[in-house]
Amino acid sequence: MKINLDRTSSGFCIGVQGTIHVAEEKLAQSGELYCLGDVVHNEVEVKRLEALGMETIDIPAFEELRNAEVLIRAHGEPPSTYETARKNNLAITDTTCPVVAKLQRTAKMLHQLGYQVVIYGKKVHPEVIGINGQCDDEGVVIKHPDLSDPEEIAPLDLSRKTALISQTTMDVPGFYELKRNLEKLFAEHGHRNPGTQSGEWMAVRDIDITAEKTGALAMPKLVFKDTICRQVSSRNGKLRDFALANDCIVFAAGRKSSNGQVLYSICKDANPHSYFIEDVDEIRPEWFVGENGKPVESVGICGATSTPMWLLEKVANYIDKTFGDGSSNPNA
C-alpha cells in the first residue's frame, strides 16, 4: 500500500503561515500570548500552541483584559476590536492576512460610497464579522447562492445601488451563481445597470472604486468584485486530481474550517472513498480494504489551508506503520 502525501495543494496558506510564525516567535520570546479566538480553525494546532503558552480568549474575556498583548489572527477583526484594545491599553499584534486586509478596505470604501454591500459567506465566520464591521454591520450576508433562505435575502433593498463581494475562502462557482441570481432578482424588480438588457452587474477593480471615491469616474449602480483568494481556490483542481489518483483519501482538517469543508467536498465528489478526520484517533482500518477484500494500492493524505503539514505527516506515518508495511516513506 503506497502512501501519497499531498504537499502542493494542502497545508497552511500564506496568511495562516504568517500568523503561526508570529505566534511561535512571540511565545519563544515571552512564553505567553493571548489570541482572540482560535488562532486557526484546527483544534490540533490550537492545542499545540496553547501548550507553548498561548491562551485563547473570546470577546467577553477580551473586553475585560487590560495591559496585555493580544494576537489578531489571519481572519481579521472589525474596527470595534481595535477600539476596545485602545481603551484597555492592549498591545495588538496584528497578523490579519494581507488578502483579507485588502478586502476589508474594499468593503469599507464601497460602504462609504453608499453601496449596499452583499457578502457571499457565512454570517458567524470571523472573517465575515470583520468585513461586515467595515460596513458598520450593515452588510447583507448570504451563504446560499440559490437565494433559498428567506431570512438571508429579507434585508436586501432592491432599490439601492449594490455591490457583491465574497469571504475569501468561499467557492468560486457559488459566488458566480449568487451573482447571476442577484442579477435576475434585481432585474425582475426593474433595477438594472443602464445599457444592459439582461441586468448584468459590472465587474469592478480597486482602481474603479478609487476613481469613484475621488470623483474621477462614476461606477454603475450594480457591481461585483470577486474577492475569493486565488491561492485557496487554485488548490481545488489540484486536489480533485489528487483524489482521483488515489484509491482512498484521508482528509485532515478542523471541523470549524470553512475551507476544509469546501475542499473535503471536492475530494468526496471526485472519490467516494474519502474520509474526514481531525486527528489519527479517528482513522478506521476498513477504509483501507478494497472491494476485493485486499488492501487498497494507494492512500492519499491531504488537508485544508488551516491544516499544518506536521499533522499531515503524522497521519501519513501513522497509516503507513499501522496499516501498511512501513516502507512508503511519506515524508520524502
Swiss-Prot record:
Cofactor note: Binds 1 [4Fe-4S] cluster per subunit.
Residues noted as binding dimethylallyl diphosphate in the record, renumbered to the chain: 41, 75, 125, 257-259, 306
Cofactor(s) the protein needs: [4Fe-4S] cluster
Keyword Lipoprotein: no
GO biological process annotation, one example: dimethylallyl diphosphate biosynthetic process
Binding residues annotated for isopentenyl diphosphate, in chain numbering: 41, 75, 125, 257-259, 306
Catalytic activity: isopentenyl diphosphate + 2 oxidized [2Fe-2S]-[ferredoxin] + H2O = (2E)-4-hydroxy-3-methylbut-2-enyl diphosphate + 2 reduced [2Fe-2S]-[ferredoxin] + 2 H(+); dimethylallyl diphosphate + 2 oxidized [2Fe-2S]-[ferredoxin] + H2O = (2E)-4-hydroxy-3-methylbut-2-enyl diphosphate + 2 reduced [2Fe-2S]-[ferredoxin] + 2 H(+)
Residues reported in the UniProt entry to bind [4Fe-4S] cluster: 13, 97, 229
Binding annotation for (2E)-4-hydroxy-3-methylbut-2-enyl diphosphate: 41, 75, 125, 168, 257-259, 306
Coiled coil: none
Active site as annotated: 127
Keywords linked to the UniProt accession: 4Fe-4S, Iron, Iron-sulfur, Isoprene biosynthesis, Metal-binding, Oxidoreductase
CDD domains referenced in this protein's UniProt entry, alphabetically: lytB_ispH (cd13944)
Group of enzyme by EC: oxidoreductase
Assigned protein family: Belongs to the IspH family.
HAMAP family for the chain: IspH
Name of the protein: 4-hydroxy-3-methylbut-2-enyl diphosphate reductase
Organism whose genome encodes this protein: Chlorobaculum tepidum (strain ATCC 49652 / DSM 12025 / NBRC 103806 / TLS) (Chlorobium tepidum)
Native organism taxonomy: Bacteria, Pseudomonadati, Chlorobiota, Chlorobiia, Chlorobiales
Gene: ispH
